[in-house]
């Protein structure tokens, strides 16, 4: 269907571009004067078969228009050697081209490069591929002069394919080659991607551990400072959101951590107190955020009434209490507990003590075992540093 459509389009274009018959007469006479090709009549191509004229007509069209017509019709073009229409071969991309390098060194000289064996995990095929690549090239070394670059994957050494060979064996082959080394390398970005992926997983695991330690410290702080045992973990997310809102709105002049802000009531930074309402069992945390330098308030004026004779023996600290040392802003967060605030204080204290004694050890054991399981999926990290990276 596609070839028929293209033939019709070609005939229409020829009909519109053809001149008048008077102007076409000399061409026809010249065609009659030209000798006919010798040969049997059966050698002529049938009118319906695609030939050189058809391919010439197809090459006149723009490739984008031709591909669009093929996509709409669902047809394909007949293949022919030497045809101008070929699909791009992405397997021969520049980053997958191999190159052969010859390194020459002196008797008391090294080649000047370091190799490392890494494991690439293919999720689709559920397998791990061990790849040996160049991780470092020294300055003004035979390796740099030969054109070896960091990131080159070593495919063969002295004509020997090193696929599936262990790291130590590859090092022995290179050391036994003498002063002349012939390497076949393959450059690609898969090694760099694998390194970044492994580092990303490690940072995610570290962040998970630090976040767990941070929440554990917040639990201990609430228990030690306020005497509270909060079972709902969403309270810490609420406190974090309030703190971020205060920082974003500019209410807090300094970016202080949340731990010093929830200090003891007598500290210079600020204090915290717990208040319990009469009609509601919710818990209110009020945090006072003070400035960096405490500013003393002016003393209150003395009372106007006359003092009796017994007031002479009263200490001055009772009559004139000390002013507050800092000007502070307060932010209250209402966190309703699931079970109310009417529990026995002895049971709460016992539960908090058990959490403080057992929670940290269990949490550390869990994180350590999770990290050990994570390292099992990275074969390059399970081996020793001597086997993983070698200087040549």
From Swiss-Prot:
Residues 180-257 are annotated as: Interaction with PSCD3. The modification Omega-N-methylarginine is found at residue 269. Keywords: Cell membrane, Cytoplasm, Membrane, Methylation, Phosphoprotein, Postsynaptic cell membrane, Synapse. GO terms for molecular function: identical protein binding; PDZ domain binding; small GTPase binding. One of its GO terms (biological process) is intracellular protein transport. Residues 100-189 form the PDZ domain. GO terms for cellular component: cytoplasm; glutamatergic synapse; nuclear envelope lumen; perinuclear region of cytoplasm; plasma membrane; postsynaptic density; postsynaptic membrane. Plays a role in intracellular trafficking and contributes to the macromolecular organization of group 1 metabotropic glutamate receptors (mGluRs) at synapses. This is General receptor for phosphoinositides 1-associated scaffold protein. It comes from Mus musculus.
């Amino acid at each position: 269907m596609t070839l028929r459509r293209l033939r019709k389009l070609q005939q229409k274009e020829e009909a519109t571009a053809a001149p008048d018959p008077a102007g076409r007469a000399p061409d026809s006479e010249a065609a009659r004067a030209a000798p006919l090709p010798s040969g049997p009549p059966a050698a002529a191509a049938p009118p319906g078969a695609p030939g050189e004229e058809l391919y010439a007509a197809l090459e006149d069209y723009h490739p984008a228009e031709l591909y669009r017509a093929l996509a709409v019709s669902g047809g394909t073009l007949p293949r022919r050697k030497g045809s101008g229409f070929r699909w791009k071969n992405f397997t021969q991309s520049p980053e997958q081209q191999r190159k052969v390098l010859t390194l020459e060194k002196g008797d008391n000289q090294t080649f000047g490069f370091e190799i490392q064996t890494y494991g690439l995990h293919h999720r689709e095929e559920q397998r791990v591929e061990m790849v040996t690549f160049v991780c470092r090239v020294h300055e003004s070394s035979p390796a740099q002069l030969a054109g070896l670059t960091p990131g080159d994957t070593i495919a063969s050494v002295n004509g020997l394919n090193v696929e599936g060979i262990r790291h130590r064996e590859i090092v022995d082959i290179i050391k036994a080659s003498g002063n002349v080394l012939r390497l076949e390398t393959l450059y690609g970005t898969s090694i760099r991607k694998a390194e970044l992926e492994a580092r990303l997983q490690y940072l995610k695991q570290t962040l998970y551990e630090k976040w767990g330690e941070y929440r554990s410290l917040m639990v201990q702080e609430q228990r030690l400072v306020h005497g509270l045992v909060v079972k709902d973990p969403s309270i810490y997310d609420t406190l974090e959101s309030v703190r971020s809102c205060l920082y974003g709105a500019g209410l807090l002049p300094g970016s202080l951590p949340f731990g010093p802000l929830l200090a003891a009531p007598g500290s210079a930074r600020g204090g915290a107190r717990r208040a319990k309402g009469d009609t509601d069992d919710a818990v209110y945390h009020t945090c006072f955020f003070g400035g960096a330098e405490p500013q003393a308030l002016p003393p209150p004026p003395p009372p106007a009434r006359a003092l009796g004779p017994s007031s002479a023996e009263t200490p001055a600290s009772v009559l004139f209490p000390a002013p507050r040392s800092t000007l502070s802003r307060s932010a209250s967060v209402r966190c309703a507990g699931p079970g109310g605030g009417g529990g026995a204080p002895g049971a709460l204290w016992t539960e908090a003590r058990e959490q403080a004694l057992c929670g940290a050890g269990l949490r550390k054991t869990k994180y350590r075992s999770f990290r050990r399981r994570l390292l099992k999926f990275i074969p390059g990290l399970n081996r020793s540093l001597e086997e993983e990276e070698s200087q040549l």
